[in-house]
Structure formats: structure tokens, C-alpha cells
């Protein structure tokens, strides 16, 4: 009976380590996203400072900001459309893979029959 306990303990340790690894991967991905977001903010401010010149009126600055906003909104829309297309392709592939798996499972059942 003693040999079962260490084995069970090993399984629990494996599960704990696997969960920790997954959590670390999620945290790394979150941090990478935050880094990208902040780098984009810095770039946005750099771009804005390139367009704004001394002596510009508030209306001119607001027009620049409005144009930049429109450009970014258009990009977001483009990415949403692209993401939808990719998701559709992924779903189609999942269906095909599932069908292939079902055919293989059926064939293995048929092959095992006497």
C-alpha cells in the first residue's frame, strides 16, 4: 500500500506543476499584452507630437486627433473582420478534423470485428 501513496503524491505534484506552468503562461501572455499596449501608447504620443506644431489652434489639434481616431477605428474594424474570417476557417477545420477522427474511430471498430 505504501507504493500507491508516493505514486498518488507524484500525480498530485505533476498536476500542481502543470497548473502552475499554465498560470505562468497566462501571466506571461498578459504581461506581453500590457507591454504591447504601452508601447503602442508611447508610439501614439510620439506620432501626435510629430503632427502638433507650436502655434496651432485648438481646433487644428482636435482635427488631427479626430483623424487619428478615425484611422484607428478603421483598423479595429479591419481586425475584427479578419478575426471573424479566421474564426470561421478554424471552425471549418475543427469540423473536418472531427469528421476524420470519427471515420478513423469507425474504421478501427470495423477492423477489430471478426
Curated annotation (Swiss-Prot):
Question: Coiled coil located at which positions?
Answer: 21-41, 69-103
Keywords noted in UniProt: Coiled coil, Cytoplasm
**A cellular component annotation (GO) from this entry:** cytosol
Where is this protein localized, as stated in its record?
Cytoplasm
UniProt function note: Pole-localizer protein involved in the regulation of several cellular processes.
Family to which this protein belongs:
Belongs to the pole-localizer TmaR family.
**Protein name, per record:** Pole-localizer protein TmaR
Q: Which organism is it from?
A: Sodalis glossinidius (strain morsitans)
Amino acid at each position: 500500500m505504501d507504493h500507491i501513496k508516493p505514486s498518488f503524491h507524484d500525480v498530485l505534484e505533476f498536476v500542481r506543476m502543470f497548473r502552475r506552468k499554465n498560470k505562468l503562461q497566462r501571466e506571461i501572455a498578459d504581461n506581453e499584452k500590457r507591454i504591447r499596449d504601452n508601447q503602442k501608447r508611447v508610439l501614439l504620443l510620439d506620432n501626435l507630437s510629430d503632427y502638433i506644431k507650436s502655434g496651432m489652434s485648438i481646433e487644428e489639434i482636435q482635427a488631427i486627433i479626430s483623424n487619428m481616431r478615425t484611422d484607428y477605428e478603421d483598423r479595429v474594424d479591419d481586425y475584427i473582420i479578419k478575426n471573424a474570417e479566421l474564426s470561421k476557417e478554424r471552425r471549418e477545420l475543427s469540423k473536418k478534423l472531427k469528421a476524420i477522427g470519427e471515420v478513423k474511430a469507425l474504421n478501427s471498430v470495423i477492423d477489430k470485428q471478426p
